[in-house]
Each structure stands twice: as structure tokens, then as C-alpha cells.
Design a protein with these regions (language model features):
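Acidic, Ser/Thr- and Gly-enriched intrinsically disordered low-complexity segments
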Residues: 1-175
């Protein structure tokens, strides 16, 4: 039996920065807003009807919840000595959402990471990969050791579709 595919959020800017789900999310909330502008139609000087005009589409968003549980392993995700701790995963997500080089003069380096969310192989009928940025992170710490070590945490991550190539083209044109 093949191994279960795990959801991964990886930085497109730093190949060593990624978070793989310890437990896959129970659900993914994918949404996209479509803008419609309302216009009153006047008939004989009376606003009689409302017409709508397509105004464009907002980027797709994805919300998911990840559970990191090290309760049985003193805060580590597995019994392996080199295993990540719960807080390592939380910090990695926060790092992907943080500005990479705050003092840099280059605006492309003075921004948070572009990310890629994947779950399974490209050839499957699963959720398509999403190039995105992290829009929000909410961490709920659920269990602690006597010394304060975080043993379990639930992290809700909000992501917004972003195409770095298209953004780079717009940036070059606007200079």
C-alpha cells in the first residue's frame, strides 16, 4: 500500500523552508470572490430595474487547519531523534509569512515568501497545487509540558493565490 500523501506548504524563495502536515487537514475551504457592479436602469425617469456588470475576479483563497501533536514525544512530532518539534513547525509557518529581508533596498526581497501548497501527485484528481502567499496565521496552543514546552498546537492558515511571474512583470512595467 502506498504511503499517504501529505499536504505541504513550501517557500518558493527558500528551498529549505517548508512545513509538511503531520496529519492532513480534515477539510480545505477554497473560495473566490467575483465582483459584480449594480447599475440602476431608468425607465421614464424612474429607477425600474437593476442591472449587473462583471467587474473581475479576486484571487482564490484557501483556508486550512494543521494539527501538530508531540504530546507522546515530549513536544517532538515523532520519536526520531532528529524529528521536528511542534514549535519548529509553527515558527516555519510564521517565517514564510514574514518579510524576508526587511532592510533591503530591492522591493522583491523586502516581502514575505511566495509559497506553494501541494497535496499528492500532479496527476491525481486531488486538489491542484496553489502558488500563493500566506495571508493569515492563527495559532492555538493546546497542550504544554510542565516546563512550558508546547506539546500540541493547531494552526489555521489563510492563503491567497499569487503568481510571482505575473507580479514581477507588473513590477517591471510600472518602473
Amino acid at each position: 500500500m502506498p504511503a499517504t500523501a501529505k499536504l505541504t506548504i513550501a517557500s518558493k524563495d527558500d528551498v529549505n523552508l517548508q512545513v509538511t502536515a503531520q496529519y492532513n487537514p480534515r477539510e480545505l475551504l477554497v473560495s473566490q470572490t467575483i465582483d459584480w457592479h449594480e447599475h440602476q436602469i431608468l425607465k421614464k425617469d424612474v429607477a425600474d430595474e437593476v442591472d449587473v456588470e462583471f467587474g473581475g475576479m479576486k484571487p482564490e483563497t484557501l483556508q486550512l487547519e494543521l494539527l501538530f501533536d508531540g504530546f507522546e514525544n515530549q513536544g517532538r512530532l515523532t520519536r526520531d531523534v532528529g524529528s521536528f518539534a511542534v514549535m519548529n513547525q509553527v515558527q516555519a509557518l510564521k517565517e514564510m509569512a514574514s518579510v524576508r529581508f526587511p532592510g533591503d533596498r530591492d522591493p522583491d526581497r523586502r516581502r514575505p515568501h511566495y509559497c506553494l501548497v501541494v497535496w499528492g501527485d500532479k496527476g491525481t484528481l486531488g486538489v491542484p497545487p496553489l502558488r500563493c502567499v500566506i495571508e493569515s496565521i492563527a495559532v492555538k496552543y493546546l497542550a504544554f509540558a510542565d516546563d512550558g514546552t508546547v506539546l500540541r498546537a493547531s494552526v489555521t492558515v489563510g492563503l491567497k493565490a499569487a503568481d510571482p511571474v505575473a507580479i514581477a512583470r507588473r513590477t517591471v512595467r510600472s518602473r
